[in-house]
């Protein structure tokens, strides 16, 4: 089945939001990118807030699927944890973009409520997944796993932000290696 106009709008909106955040969701610019009239976007998304919420929802849903696939592909929790930073690296590889959840989190005070809710779900999905992997790998006790998961999520998002600000993907790799050497991320032997 081919992509619908709605899918094309959401894909274009995702790229715009990864490069420019919520404020980068310009209806006219998205319409030009997709090759439709701006009114057509309003048919699918009656407001910018609804578009922002829909693109943020799709982003965390895609991330949840990516994390599930990562776990299935790697076969064990420790390997999955060691591959986790690569999810964030892919955004940098794609036009030096930032994780959309991180970008929109930085704009949090200016986001409409429905967008805030979806952005929070992105962080929740990542922290929950990390917490489970940490427990399954035997790296943390259940009562400590969420705290370490938040630290890992925050550190990797921060590494991505710093690498983007320098347009230097190798800096991201260096920071991730540093986190592993410091014991925040597991090292596979």
Please report, for each region that a protein language model flagged, where it lies by residue.
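Hydrophobic alpha-helical connector segments
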Residues: 54-58, 67-97, 148-152
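Amphipathic, non-transmembrane alpha-helical scaffold segments
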Residues: 2, 10, 56, 60, ...
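Helix-turn-helix
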Residues: 8, 12-50, 54
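N-terminal intrinsically disordered/low-complexity leader segments
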Residues: 1-4, 74, 187-189
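Amphipathic C-terminal alpha-helical segment
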Residues: 91, 132, 153-171, 182-189
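Short, charged helix-capping/linker segments at alpha-helix termini
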Residues: 23-24, 68, 139-146
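Short helix-capping/turn signature of helix-turn-helix
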Residues: 45, 103-110
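Amphipathic alpha-helical packing segments from all-alpha helical-bundle domains
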Residues: 64, 82, 94-98, 112-138, ...
């Amino acid at each position: 089945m081919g992509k619908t106009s709605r899918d094309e709008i959401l894909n274009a909106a995702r790229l715009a939001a990864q490069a420019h955040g919520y404020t980068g969701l310009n209806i006219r610019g998205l319409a030009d990118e997709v090759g439709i009239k701006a009114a057509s976007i309003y048919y699918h998304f009656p407001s910018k807030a609804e578009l922002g919420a829909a693109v943020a929802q799709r982003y965390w849903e895609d991330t949840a699927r990516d994390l599930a696939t990562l776990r299935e592909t790697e076969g064990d929790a420790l390997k999955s944890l060691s591959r986790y930073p690569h999810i964030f690296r892919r955004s940098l590889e794609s036009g030096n973009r930032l994780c959309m959840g991180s970008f929109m989190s930085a704009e949090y005070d200016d986001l409409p409520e429905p967008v805030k809710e979806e952005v929070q779900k992105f962080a929740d999905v990542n922290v929950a997944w990390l917490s489970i992997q940490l427990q399954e790998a035997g790296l943390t006790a259940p009562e400590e796993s969420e705290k370490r998961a938040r630290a890992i999520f925050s550190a990797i998002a921060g590494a991505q932000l710093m690498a983007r600000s320098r347009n230097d993907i190798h800096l991201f790799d260096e920071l991730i290696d540093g986190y592993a050497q410091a014991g925040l991320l597991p090292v596979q032997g």
